[in-house]
Amino acid sequence: QLQILKDYGVTEEAMGCPVKSSMETVQIGISGVRHQPVYVDKNASEADGIILYNRIKPHTSFRGPYESGLMKMMAIGLGKQKGAESIHHQSPAIMHELVEEYGRTILENAPVLGGIAIIENAYDDTYLIKGLSPEEIISEEPKLKEISYKTIAHLLFDKCDVLVVDKIGKNISGD
């Protein structure tokens, strides 16, 4: 992770502060409905504050109020491998519920100061950047996801006999 950050220019010298990364987590709480342990990165849990930063967009595998965004970043990203495994070992049919449940638990128990939500358009250009307080993450992210649905790439036809795809991958989204 440190090498990836360095490749993006995120270094201690450039940022003027320590840049830490590890897979070590701590249990931050128990999820509200399913009573599952919720984990966050140990360094993040000890920080004065956490500012989340992520794109808000539809998820390719599940639908719900929270798909790919700040709530998922908390549930899976801040939870590192241990947090991701605790979610992915459960039924994919409830993934959207787990993302919300774990995200809410983290907001209640970790020093989250807020988040920066990014929405891109069909050309991968920034369409909208919005700062959110912890409370607004819960209320505004579903609205931002709906905006994202309207701005992502779409196939402009209902029926298709053959579709040739030039590029495909996890980093490419559309509907």
Stretch-by-stretch model annotation:
Residues 2-65:
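An acidic, phosphate/nucleotide-engaging active-site surface
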Residues 40-171:
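Conserved, well-structured core segments that form the ligand-binding/active-site neighborhood
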Residues 174-175:
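Short, intrinsically disordered, charge-balanced linker/junction segments flanking boundaries
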